[in-house]
Amino acid sequence: MSELLLELFSEEIPAFMQKNAEEGYLNIFTQIFAESAIFAKVQVFVGPRRITLYATHLPKVTLPQEEEIKGPSIESPEAAINGFCSAHNVSKLELSTKLINNQLYYFFVKKTKEREIKEILPKIIIEAINKYSWAKSMFWGDYKIKWIRPLRNILCIFDGEVLPLQFGHLTANNITYGHRLTDNKKLEVTDFKDYRNKLLENNVVLERIKREEIIKTGLLELANSQNLNIKEDARLIEEVAGLSEFPVVLLGKIAQKFLELPKEVLIASMRTHQKYFCLFDKTGNFAPYFLFVSNGRFANAELVIQGNEKVLSARLSDALYFYKQDIAKTLESRLGKLEAVTFHAKLGNLREKIEHITDICNYIAPNNKDLITAAKLCKSDLVSEMVGEFPDLQGIMGYYYAKYEGLNEEIAAAIRDHYKPQGLSDNVASGNAALLALADKLDSLVGLMIAGEAPTGSGDPYALRRQALGIIRIILENKLELNLNDLIIFSLKLYGNSADKDLITSFFEERAKFYFKNKYDILLINAVLDLNLVDTQFKLETLKEFLIEDAGKQLLNAYKRASNIIGDQKITGLVDASLFSTQPEKDLFEVVQKISPQIIDSIADKDYKRALNLLSFLLTPITSFFDNVLVNDPDPKIAQNRLSLLQNICELLNKIAKFNRL
């Protein structure tokens, strides 16, 4: 058995694309080898400057293959049959027949001879390289090949020899290169073992997983050495492993003056911009240290540390300057600047949006002064220096500025959390923050729908589906007894619009169905859904439990039987007890009369479980009615009266849910 070693050596591959490339090339090569009857064990390694394929257990020759090719039916015109024979260079006598769906077809068995693997590998490799689709790729120079970054070299060795491979302007060889900064020299290799060893000798760790383990171990060791804690950050570890060929973890210091910055600012400066790891003391407070990953082993590590400390100090100095500039002004004093910030070309500026949000909050919770204050100030930090530098800190900086001004925690927290939830995995805000988040998201969604930005099958540029789910989650997880239909009407009035109500309510209904269908049957959802979402969820849960029980199943069957008897007939008029001629119909009507007011009261109290239990009292008399009474009596008055009785029962059930949809 033979082995194949392929290295695509390039300029720096973006770290966030490396893992996908590793998985993508592994799948592609595995599939293409299998399709070519080459059954090999395939491994792919990825790093900042190289993607490496290592395949083992390759045979030296392919096994003979047989492929059965279907031709025309035996009843086809002779010209079609001759054309098939000509296309495959065979005579009609060489064809076999096979019965498919009671029809005989001609078949030709195509046989391929065994071939040396090294003859077919170049074509397979080029096909596999081209098959992977990068999220972004580029041409460079006058070359005709396209890749994520300019390719500089291709190493390709099969069975100890260079495989004659041509990819664009590059010809395969047996050369690789060491670490770009410390050992950037040509390395001749003979096989995979030699390749991996020489890379390691020249400060390149081939395996991404191994680089990540080195980083994890280094982070923990240095954190423990200072008696500090480090928060687990798998995503950042993966990213820095994609930035370094030979990771070395080092410890730097932060000047004490910078610790007066909010911790989110420190984290944003260090993690997002510098790819540094934050450290905390045992009480959870920010420690004046940071960890970073150096790309390579350098003789003077202290110089590397000082350089990184200097870079971080410069960034934090800017942040501290912005912070002090910001706290010199109140949030209210920034409101005028919001007039210069466009929310949407058709919807006005952020100052106008603030007025809408405030009006909605006042509609939801009249006389809630803290909520109204938070609503008026919730967007002020968007025109601050700090949020201009760190957009992800919107809301968070508003919280700190509100606290600095002396506003209470309820107001500050509402400003901070009013963007929540920002996705399915994000938590929902509570208290005033939930009401403010609801008002903000609702105003955005209603306004953007009016502006013609409704989602389509091809896109949702303003993430309105996510906004709607956020609103639904806020209402349900906070058990807000609000009618979304009323809120939509009120929000539309703020834009002087009422024409788009049906569009928006339909959109919310579809999103509510999407939300509920993870837990409930779609038929049940269709039977109870309205835009009082808390009530809808309560009905769903109650009905789901009830319909599992025997009584629930029997009641549903009784409803369907009554509904089928009524059919499309329009039943009018009250039930006339004097027309009853049988005991079962008298008994049924008596139960209906007795339980109806109790059911109506239970529904008004949202006690749906009691209402359903009361409906269960219908089971015995309605079964007797169906067994012993002819509904469509020859006397039309009697028939109409019995139909009216069944209609009453159906209407009673439909007060809880649309049973005709179950």
UniProtKB/Swiss-Prot annotation:
Any one GO BP annotation for this protein: arginyl-tRNA aminoacylation
Enzyme class: ligase
Domain of life of the source: Bacteria
Stretches assigned to coiled coil: none
Alphabetized UniProt keyword annotations: Aminoacyl-tRNA synthetase, ATP-binding, Cytoplasm, Ligase, Nucleotide-binding, Protein biosynthesis
Keyword check for ATP-binding: yes
GO cellular component, one term: cytosol
Pfam hit, one: DALR_1
Disulfide bridge positions per record: none
Localisation per UniProt entry: Cytoplasm
Broad class of the protein's primary localization: cytoplasm
The EC number(s) this enzyme carries: 6.1.1.14
GO molecular function terms attached to this record: arginine-tRNA ligase activity; ATP binding; glycine-tRNA ligase activity
Reactions accelerated catalytically: tRNA(Gly) + glycine + ATP = glycyl-tRNA(Gly) + AMP + diphosphate
Subunit structure, interactors included: Tetramer of two alpha and two beta subunits.
Family: Belongs to the class-II aminoacyl-tRNA synthetase family.
PANTHER family (alphabetical): GLYCINE--TRNA LIGASE, CHLOROPLASTIC_MITOCHONDRIAL 2, GLYCYL-TRNA SYNTHETASE
Name of the protein described by the UniProt record: Glycine--tRNA ligase beta subunit
Organism for this UniProt entry: Rickettsia akari (strain Hartford)
